[in-house]
Amino acid sequence: MRVTYQTLTLTLGSYHYDIALVLRDALFVNSIMSNSEVWHNVQLKHTQAFEKSDQILLKSIVNAHAKTATEAFYLELAVLPLNYRLSVRRFMYLWHILHRDGDELIRKIYEAQKCLSVRGDWTELVEAEKAKYGISESDSEIAEMSREKFKSKIQKKIEAHAVRCLNNIAENHSKSEQIVDYDFKRKAYFTDRRFSKTDVQLLFALRTKMLDCKTNFQNQYAEDLSCRFCKDNGNIEDEDHILRCTVLNNEKYDVKFSDVYGNIDQQYKAVQVYKTVMRRRKVYLEIIQKSS
């Protein structure tokens, strides 16, 4: 993908994620959704196809593991799944139609579809989405609204619905339950200039429970979750134990795994410690692999 290539080859420093998401919108979303507001007979399988591509792109932007929970990208980055973006476009096209003169062809087609609609018609999609998002305004009321007022109203309702759905998924997913957040804003670590590109990637992996430790990939390690380094069966290899493992560490750190869900200062401190430990851990893993 052009977006991935450009963000990987450009030296963007601490602005990497800001620019990557701008490029996502400009080069990917606007391209793949060109004229999508007029699509009719749109089914779930159609939106899933381009959402899958978007999810691959988001994973590449944060260099995430392939099995990372999908909802995590949207909640951490505060970006909407593309089917909700499509809904916004469709409603704005409705506003456009309702502001045309009654004798214009586009308005005549709309009025005819309303009177003689069949399954899959564009007007049917609009009515279904009005009910879905709780948009009660009639055509005449929409026609009286300014573009800015109508867009602001529908964006708020669609975003609120999307956030509820994403958090409902996260609440029932063990890897995402800690990042449930109804305040739909990009997490501060993506924009805090203290965090390097790799710091952000490490913190994202920690917060989504995709760090390379046995408890995060239990199917891979069957029933043996003991630490690969200290070999103590009483020590399960999880994010907390990595900080305390006597083989990996010769000092005690004043951080704990839960700090990755704390405030931005706690997150920064935790990432610096994890970065040091994971660097040392990588060396030990290479030694183990060579000797096995």
Place the predicted regions along the sequence by residue:
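Non-catalytic, peripheral interaction segments enriched in hydrophobic/basic residues
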Residues: 1-114
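Generic detection of long, well-ordered alpha-helical segments
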Residues: 18, 40-51, 140, 144, ...
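Active-site-proximal structural scaffolding
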Residues: 21, 50-51, 66, 75, ...
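Short, surface-exposed acidic
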Residues: 62-71, 137-140, 262-270
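Flexible, low-complexity interdomain linkers flanking nucleic-acid-processing modules
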Residues: 90-201, 206
